[in-house]
Amino acid sequence: MGSIEPPNASSCLVYQTITEFADFPDHDQKLWWHSTAPMFAEMLKVAGYDIHSRYKALGLYQKFIIPFLGVYPTKTNDRWLSILTRYGTPFELSLNCTHSVVRYTFEPINAATGSLKDPFNTHAIWDALDTLIPLQKGIDLEFFAHLKRDLTVNDQDTAYLLEKKKVGGQIRTQNKLALDLKGGEFVLKAYIYPALKSLATGKPVQELMFDSVHRLSHQYPTLAAPLRKLEEYVHSRGTSSTASPRLISCDLCDPRQSRIKIYLLELNVSLESMEDLWTLGGRRNDTQTLAGLEMIRELWDLINLPTGILSYPEPYLKLGEVPNEQLPLMANYTLHHDDPMPEPQVYFTTFGMNDGRVTDGLATFFRRHGYTHMLQTYRDSLRAYYPHVDHDTVNYLHAYISFSYRKGSPYLSVYLQSFETGDWPISSFGAPILEPVSKKMCRGHPVSFEVPLTKQQVVASE
């Protein structure tokens, strides 16, 4: 009997087929495709998207998103560092495991990003939106335009920050986009980080964010009640609170349906802190909240996050650097038009933890709660995304696990390292060769993460 082939995302037919016919305007775009598309294609398949939706999603990604990812990251090149990942890479895939929804987030980057024309990447997002709006009905920018005007730097702010040399090691990302893939359609979301605006104006991030949403609630009064509740909770934590507002997001749809989400960073990594975030300090105590709380306690035991007071680490990790760090907790609160109470979502920050143990914890959760498909596929899919890493020791694949509880059902998502996937480490992309070995390949860059790589493996891959 022949041996069973181990799972490998580079074998995904949709990825291979698009590769045959795709036109890449430059070398960087080709590298981005072969680094990320195997995992993307495999994730869509595992999540149960039909073949037409998979081709459409990957085709859109190849043609319209990759051009906004900038130069392909290597250990030596000069590139824009994005807050999206600890390695500064501007693209991340995530999977809602309980409802089988794939999403990806990216920070739009263009030729002006980081230059004197746009030193803080304020404007590239508009070019990306101009590209995406014709592709999906119903995109509306009203909430985004309001928040962006209030919370990202304008030309005057930019000149001030440059003149006073205010921005040293400060994280420079100001905005990013996410696409939730629903069948053959997508739902677009935007995220804004006001840290640079705070630096330019001298106003705290918390004040900037809440004031902006307050002004928005004058036009949309249904946002006022949940905003007041959230603001009350944040203020009740006091001036020495370990939790603070960090970013804000909105749906790019009809403002009457668009949700505002306000994110808090919690430096005290403990179950007690997560319980406080989930219940808004005891303000949420309904049956659904308490049912979700029991699952949070279960996940806490299964994932076993190390506890302690943690700051967000600086600077970025170098490509290929194995993390020796842990991130603070995070939570977001959705302001719904029809609910006076903010809806919480909490984040288990698993980056830096052993991915095998994280996977074991998730598998136990899937088994206990009847998510049979995920139980049967999750471990193999992770191995397919990264077939050349040691899954017993690797500790940088799971960045976050998010949890919320709605309408009697858990919503659990994983946010995963999405870089150098599939056969990248042993292909002509990962191995330093001078010329392409086929029309599918191109001159390679050194692989970022160390993997066992023998001459025989390279020859076999050719």
UniProtKB/Swiss-Prot annotation:
Domain of life, per lineage: Eukaryota
Disulfide bonds, paired cysteine numbers: none
Catalytic activity reported: L-tryptophan + dimethylallyl diphosphate = 4-(3-methylbut-2-enyl)-L-tryptophan + diphosphate
Keyword Transferase: yes
Keyword entries, A-Z: Alkaloid metabolism, Transferase
The protein's Enzyme Commission number: 2.5.1.34
Pathway as given in its UniProt record: Alkaloid biosynthesis; ergot alkaloid biosynthesis
Alphabetical list of InterPro entries matching this protein: Aro_prenylTrfase (IPR033964), Aro_prenylTrfase_DMATS (IPR017795), DMATS-type_fun (IPR012148)
CDD domains per the UniProt record, alphabetical: PT-DMATS_CymD
Result of knocking out the encoding gene: Does not affect the production of roquefortine C but impairs the production of isofumigaclavines A and B.
Residue numbers binding substrate: R103, K189, Y191, R259, K261, Y263, Q345, Y347
Protein residues bound to L-tryptophan: I83, L84, E92, Y193, R246
Entry keyword Transit peptide: no
BP-aspect Gene Ontology terms: indole alkaloid biosynthetic process
MF GO annotations: tryptophan dimethylallyltransferase activity
Family listed: Belongs to the tryptophan dimethylallyltransferase family.
Subunit structure: Homodimer.
UniProt function note: Tryptophan dimethylallyltransferase; part of the gene cluster that mediates the biosynthesis of isofumigaclavines, fungal ergot alkaloids. The tryptophan dimethylallyltransferase ifgA catalyzes the first step of ergot alkaloid biosynthesis by condensing dimethylallyl diphosphate (DMAP) and tryptophan to form 4-dimethylallyl-L-tryptophan. The second step is catalyzed by the methyltransferase ifgB that methylates 4-dimethylallyl-L-tryptophan in the presence of S-adenosyl-L-methionine, resulting in the formation of N-methyl-dimethylallyl-L-tryptophan.
The protein, known as: Tryptophan dimethylallyltransferase ifgA
Gene coding for it: ifgA
